[in-house]
Amino acid sequence: EAIAAVSAAIRRNRVGISPKHKPVSFIFVGPTGVGKTELVKQLADDLFNAPESLIRLDMSEFMEKHSVSRIVGSPPGYVGYDEAGQLTEKIRRKPYSVVLFDEIEKAHPDVLNVLLQILDDGQITDAHGRKVNFENTVIVMTSNAGSDNKASGAVGFGGSADDQGKERIMKALQDFLRPEFLNRVDEIVCFNHLTKENFCGIARIML
């Protein structure tokens, strides 16, 4: 289901149905160990035929207000002004990339504001005044939001456990992401818990 949703969104962008000058964007939500990061790695390999086209930013390193300067570069007069931003410089040199923002719920709100501008305009200005175009990138954010609570079974008219899980995940995302942010994301992909059949299939592939 997750792979089908990602594939459909990529195809919509390729045929021109999605808005122009806007990168394809996803939020992968689910418990740890269900393959969110592995799918991102495979996506980078399949889209651009190069695993090194994946740019990964761990949001646990961007929890402070000043950490936003590490993305676009430090402003004039501050330490590190001569150094380019970790993200903007990589995209400027390699515009066809998959950008992974891992554990987005840990990011400082100012970092989310920068990301919102990228999702909205498809470009951002770095500390040196240069426009960096994200039109040809794929933006993926991962989160464990809503997955720490045990999914309760369907009772009465409550619907299926999967539907209840998706509702719980959406409520958890809304706790730290504003509506205008969520509305600019192409697809929110919910990863289900792995079943016994899934584990058997993974074991066969690895063996």
Where are these regions (language model features)?
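AAA+ P-loop NTPase nucleotide-binding core of proteostasis motors
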Residues: 1-207
